[in-house]
Amino acid sequence: MNEGEHQIKLDELFEKLLRARKIFKNKDVLRHSYTPKDLPHRHEQIETLAQILVPVLRGETPSNIFVYGKTGTGKTVTVKFVTEELKRISEKYNIPVDVIYINCEIVDTHYRVLANIVNYFKDETGIEVPMVGWPTDEVYAKLKQVIDMKERFVIIVLDEIDKLVKKSGDEVLYSLTRINTELKRAKVSVIGISNDLKFKEYLDPRVLSSLSEEEVVFPPYDANQLRDILTQRAEEAFYPGVLDEGVIPLCAALAAREHGDARKALDLLRVAGEIAEREGASKVTEKHVWKAQEKIEQDMMEEVIKTLPLQSKVLLYAIVLLDENGDLPANTGDVYAVYRELCEYIDLEPLTQRRISDLINELDMLGIINAKVVSKGRYGRTKEIRLNVTSYKIRNVLRYDYSIQPLLTISLKSEQRRLI
């Protein structure tokens, strides 16, 4: 095909895509970052948060709040909704309120949390702290200085606070929950949000009592509640008549199976719409929802593999090689033998077989492999290890990992299972 024919084909493709019926009116409405004007089935939590924060409008310091519930139960969106409303109403009463939102999955050290708070005020103060390099005490001193420049209320929202505490300890929480004793003008309140209630076990009792002055629990949504949420968002997200009748109930039912996760429900609806749009379909159907479910699961599995520790990646690659050699199901001993050779090849200290057995269990729990214990009669019990993800997909993810790349050209000799 010459260049002119390529151009004609591409022209035709663009024309066809332009003529296709538009599916989305505003796709952003289905994203996690969107804060809607109303939050169905969270009015009780909204009211509780408002009651705790209303002292701000009277010029009094509100309590610190600990918010918890599973993923996708509306914690973050509800806290953002209430604090944004508080900020808006405070302007009417001429009360300065600053709300600083920090995602602790990204900002996960004591230093960086403090630096982010200081830098929030940089346009006002002209003071900016680099993300590394200063003594932490100096950053904390700057934080007190910038916050206390005038009378104001500062609400610090620490989302995924458990990630911060598990990685860096609770020192930053100790500082922030006691900062009011060191301020003359400003008043600070902390809202901690967590998916993991057990993380409180990691906290010093003094920090826990300060942070948990008030607690707000978010229970999972049921399928009917998820349906209401999706119906509300769909009205803004899609053009009229593009959703088949069964699409929203199916998205709600699939997400309800996973502890009532509204994020999962919104992702399913958005991805189903994207697939329908790419196919040039005039409607989003249940078939598109099932395709969306498959795509989301694949994407999640890729992310899980990508974030595995190096030893687990080498172990997984040993299982891939056995699979490509036709040697699955394999037992732990077979896998360990290949794993040891791979470690030798990249000069990595191998773990013990007992530890590798633990890592096999972890890969099994993550759903990447299946490690079923089977009885061999008088020979005892053994694990039969199989892949749940294709070798091709695993290779595709691992090829971007520089520490694993030297192994990707290796294969096994059929009989001896030796590396070649």
Swiss-Prot record:
Pfam family, one: Cdc6_C
InterPro entries: AAA+_ATPase, ATPase_AAA_core, Cdc6_C, Cdc6_lid, ORC1/CDC6, Orc1/Cdc6_arc, P-loop_NTPase, WH-like_DNA-bd_sf
Domain of life from the UniProt record: Archaea
Keyword DNA-binding found: yes
Keyword Electron transport attributed: no
Positions in coiled-coil regions: none
GO-annotated molecular function: ATP binding; ATP hydrolysis activity; DNA binding
UniProt-listed GO biological process terms: DNA replication
Annotated SUPFAM superfamilies: P-loop containing nucleoside triphosphate hydrolases (SSF52540), Winged helix' DNA-binding domain (SSF46785)
Annotated binding of ATP, by residue: T73, G74, K75, T76, V77, Y221, R233
Keywords: ATP-binding, DNA replication, DNA-binding, Nucleotide-binding
The protein's role, per its UniProt record: Involved in regulation of DNA replication. May play essential roles in origin recognition and cell cycle control of replication. Binds specifically to the oriC region, which alters the topological structure of the DNA and introduces localized melting of the DNA duplex. May recruit the MCM helicase onto the oriC region. Shows weak ATPase activity in the absence of DNA.
Subunit architecture: Homodimer. Interacts with MCM.
Family stated for the protein in its record: Belongs to the CDC6/cdc18 family.
UniProt-recorded name of the protein: ORC1-type DNA replication protein
Protein's organism: Pyrococcus furiosus (strain ATCC 43587 / DSM 3638 / JCM 8422 / Vc1)
Gene name tied to this protein: cdc6
